[in-house]
Amino acid sequence: MRNPNEIVAEALAAIHGCPDLPSLEQIKAGYLGKSGQLTELLKSLGAMPADARKTAGARINEAKQAVEAALKIRREALQQAELDRQLAAETLDVTLPGRGLGTAGVHPVSRTLARIEALFHSIGFDVATGPEIETDFYNFTALNIPEDHPARAMHDTFYLRQNNAGGGELLRTHTSPVQIRHMQTHEPPLRIIAPGRVYRCDSDVTHTPMFHQIEGLWVDESVSFADLKGVLADFMRNFFERDDLAVRFRPSFFPFTEPSAEMDIGCVMCGGSGCRVCSHTGWLEVLGCGMVHPNVFRHVGVDAERFIGFAFGLGVERLAMLRYGVDDLRLFFENDLRFLKQFN
């Protein structure tokens, strides 16, 4: 049997001269592995006389411990050397100034929404909200929209679930359902605006599948169409900050109002002289409005003989486009910082 001390001396010399961790693992296998030199010595103990086996076994175990201790010390030294090398290669000057954080800004749609809410709040309107997933009753039936109305078609409305009666759940196509819910839980008189996201199956330069809308409602015993015209004309002139802004109302039709009207303003791009934005008419359509239909009041239990009211609805993105001179609605939703930074 080979002398364990000779093997230890040989192993220590190899360990101390080892240049890297992979080589160190090879040295370990050569002395302590399944076929390592010290392991083979242990295997040979079975052939030795019993009286010599105990002494030889103790010497071999001492040799293993010496090699293992040397391996541990050398491994730690090599690991530290590797860490020092990496740190030196990745030196960071902590005195250098850090990267500046970009300045956040309010999105133009959020900015427009807040401006509209503030203007209506200044004349006594409260903000009401409601669910974006609505039922057929609140989105259509309670608003006097007949079953054969085009708005109920699949190509215009996102239906989530339909029942056998033709109703069901859907993504609201306007915020008018908020008015219905509010009238069910609040007694007149009331003045509210209902801002929020609405959804329609439409996408082009001036339409997106999701957009923001604000609908307003004023219900009292003596509200008139003159009140409607005064409120909306005053709002538009304040919104665009133009006291001389021209406005006009054209007859129209909506199932939930009677009479109904479309409101136009003088083109804010060309001052009414005619341009591409207003199709050279000098006018821009901005909202729909009208006196609340008696059937809507009956659906929510409001006395249609005693109370009267007006309602209106406008697109927030539409007004933002006009206020900021944006010609493509989709730009508001592309999150392009080059575009958004212009409004900060």
UniProtKB/Swiss-Prot annotation:
One of its GO terms (biological process) is phenylalanyl-tRNA aminoacylation. GO terms for molecular function: ATP binding; magnesium ion binding; phenylalanine-tRNA ligase activity; tRNA binding. It is found in: Cytoplasm. It catalyses: tRNA(Phe) + L-phenylalanine + ATP = L-phenylalanyl-tRNA(Phe) + AMP + diphosphate + H(+). Its main location: cytoplasm. Its EC number is 6.1.1.20. Gene3D superfamilies: Bira Bifunctional Protein, Domain 2. One of its GO terms (cellular component) is cytoplasm. SUPFAM superfamilies: Class II aaRS and biotin synthetases, tRNA-binding arm. Its cofactor is Mg(2+). Keywords: Aminoacyl-tRNA synthetase, ATP-binding, Cytoplasm, Ligase, Magnesium, Metal-binding, Nucleotide-binding, Protein biosynthesis. HAMAP family: Phe_tRNA_synth_alpha1 (MF_00281). This is Phenylalanine--tRNA ligase alpha subunit.
